[in-house]
Amino acid sequence: MTTPLKDKYELEVIPIAIGGKKLDLLGLANWDSFIKNLEEQGEEYIRKFPFWVKIWEASVVLADHLIRIGLGKEKDILEIGAGMGVTGLFLGAFGYKITVTEYEEDALELLRMNVEHNGLDTVTVKKLDWNDPDLTETYDVICASELIYNVTFMEPIIKLLRKYLRPGGTVFLAHDVRRKCMLQFIGMIPGKYEIENIAKTMKRDDEVHKVFIHALRLK
């Protein structure tokens, strides 16, 4: 029997506002002590780091960008590697129909909790294994933030995009400018896409974060 998320982590409500709407997201409460405990494990730190517990600046920037440009309420949207699901949850808050996916069971539980907590009835949460994807639908838009932090993910994601993006569809990928893996990934993308690179900035806790958004439009 799996341990409930609330018994593994101390959770708190984190209010976030994007595009004039506010969501109350359940997230990690003891962030500083959590990171300190992981760092004390030395080499195990990165391997064990649960990337899904952090609200990445790129996910906030991506949500804001997609809300501003407008995607069309009739479109089917997929978020991959959702983590905390900031982008997908806010798209749902604005009435978009979106499937939000993750692989880690704890991340999936937290996503479902936040969907229920915020009453987002246009958001569906599904498990997705990039190496063995089993979704039955295709999508007009696929989005992700801070998706690639390991080169071994690149080929499976290229195949996943090819499998699930509809003709004429668009992929939106957002990342901090310091993430070199994503720039390497964009260089591997086949010539079937027209690529637009968009630079954004976000100020958070007196720090300016520079974020790239890559819009890949299937020709």
Annotate each PLM feature.
Residues M1-K219:
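S-adenosylmethionine-dependent methyltransferases
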